């Protein structure tokens, strides 16, 4: 699912590295917290993976961006976890 959301960058976390136990391949991600400027619980955590992590270098705190995202869920132990993955950004202010 491709969606566009607009928000103000509030926090850019450090890049995290994970290793797949089976394949021993490394996986990188960076989480960015944005505020959608709505009244109730408007904070949202967006993830940047692998090659898209470089996009976070263009982000500036307290600036407004348009984020092109894909949302997906994965099941693990009868629980579902949702990811919001960003693949394109555009500065609006």
Regions found by a protein language model. Name each.
Residues 1-93:
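Single-stranded nucleic acid-binding surfaces, predominantly the OB-fold ssDNA-binding core
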């Amino acid at each position: 699912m491709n969606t566009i959301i607009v928000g103000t960058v509030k926090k850019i976390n450090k890049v995290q590295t994970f290793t797949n136990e089976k394949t021993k391949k490394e996986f990188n991600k960076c989480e960015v917290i944005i505020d959608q400027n709505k009244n109730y619980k408007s904070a949202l955590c967006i993830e940047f993976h692998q090659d898209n992590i470089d996009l976070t270098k263009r982000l500036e705190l307290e600036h407004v961006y348009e984020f092109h995202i894909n949302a997906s869920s994965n099941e693990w132990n009868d629980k579902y976890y949702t990811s919001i993955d960003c693949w394109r950004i555009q500065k609006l202010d």
